[in-house]
A protein has these predicted regions:
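Short catalytic/metal-binding and nucleic-acid-binding patches
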Residues: 1-149
Length: 149
């Protein structure tokens, strides 16, 4: 059977998109089903990296939830100074080196166009561990950071 080649979409942000637009981002580990993200030490390192990139002015993380083999986040990128793909490439590279996380090559992003879409994706993200059968209530999942808005 031939290898399946997944179509790769460009991650460039058009110049007509306002800086500060919020994106739904999903980043997967290369090996699905293996817990690479939700150990105490790795989750702390990942959240610290999110905070560090925010302190550098590269992004503003509204919400990030770690699952065992992927993460979901709602992020506003500083696209005036950095490209979205370069920020995520750097973030993934740092965590691959420091925490030996084996990421998939690419990532998924979708720009959220209004507050209703933002809240819908936030709820989707918060309920992910419930849908996966990892907890009964979303509030029981410890691998979540959420900014005060």
């Amino acid at each position: 059977m031939p290898d399946f080649e997944r179509k790769q979409l460009p991650h460039g942000v058009p110049n007509w998109v306002a800086d500060g637009a919020v994106y739904f981002v999903a980043i997967n580990c290369r090996i699905r089903g293996e817990d690479q993200l939700t150990t105490k030490s790795k989750s702390e390192a990942i959240f610290e990296a999110f905070r560090h990139y925010e302190s550098l002015g590269k992004w503003h993380v509204r919400l990030c939830l770690l699952m065992p083999d992927h993460l979901h986040a709602l992020i506003s990128f500083n696209t005036r100074e950095y490209s979205m793909s370069s920020i995520i490439r750097s973030f993934k590279g740092y965590l691959a080196k420091e925490q030996q996380i084996d990421w998939q090559k690419n990532y998924f992003d979708h720009r959220l166009r209004n507050d209703a879409a933002l809240e819908e994706k936030a709820q989707y993200i918060r309920l992910n561990p419930v849908r996966a059968g990892l907890v009964e209530q979303a509030t029981e999942w410890p691998y979540l950071i959420e900014a005060e808005v």
